[in-house]
Amino acid sequence: MHSDAFDLKALIRPVVDFPKPGVIFRDITPLFQSPRGLRYVADQFIERYVEAEFSHIGAMDARGFLIGSIIAHQLNKPLILFRKQGKLPADVLSEGYQTEYGEAFLEVHADSLCEGDSVLIFDDLIATGGTLLAAANLVRRTGAQVFEAAAIIDLPELDGSRRLQAAGVPTFCLTEFSLSEY
């Protein structure tokens, strides 16, 4: 975790009982409405990765696109989009996974990566790790390697970061929340 005097958590809105009862959803839209907050998040990731040895950035549909595209632009790296099933127009690789809400499928264009590529994968949040594990599996199926999985938020009680690390995927998050934290 990285921290300084900036209160990142204050820009992440808790939404109780969304999308279902008992869940506290972590809404990052206030972060994107704050130029200072967005700059802070981008700067933290850029500082971490500016000299890192990877070739591509992979961003998860949909909120991962927001920060992933900024970092790809700032680091001058190609951006690979990992989309929900049925959203990509060309030949795809598909990977099923479990989320905290049920089963889903993640897809990537089959020709977007190749052997020797190294991919930093981004999402807004790590909960169960299902989305990023599916992305890591897709990356590996292309012959590429996963450099690291990065997110703004970690929910460590849901074990996603632990699951990613157990699968050989290092993780980095800017902040974390307990499941009951408001």
Swiss-Prot record:
Presence of the UniProt keyword Iron in the record: no
Subcellular localization: Cytoplasm
Keywords, ordered alphabetically: Cytoplasm, Glycosyltransferase, Purine salvage, Transferase
Enzyme Commission designation: 2.4.2.7
Molecular function GO labels: adenine phosphoribosyltransferase activity
Entry's family note: Belongs to the purine/pyrimidine phosphoribosyltransferase family.
HAMAP family: Aden_phosphoribosyltr (MF_00004)
Job of this protein: Catalyzes a salvage reaction resulting in the formation of AMP, that is energically less costly than de novo synthesis.
Name of the protein described by the UniProt record: Adenine phosphoribosyltransferase
Organism from which the protein derives: Pseudomonas putida (strain ATCC 47054 / DSM 6125 / CFBP 8728 / NCIMB 11950 / KT2440)
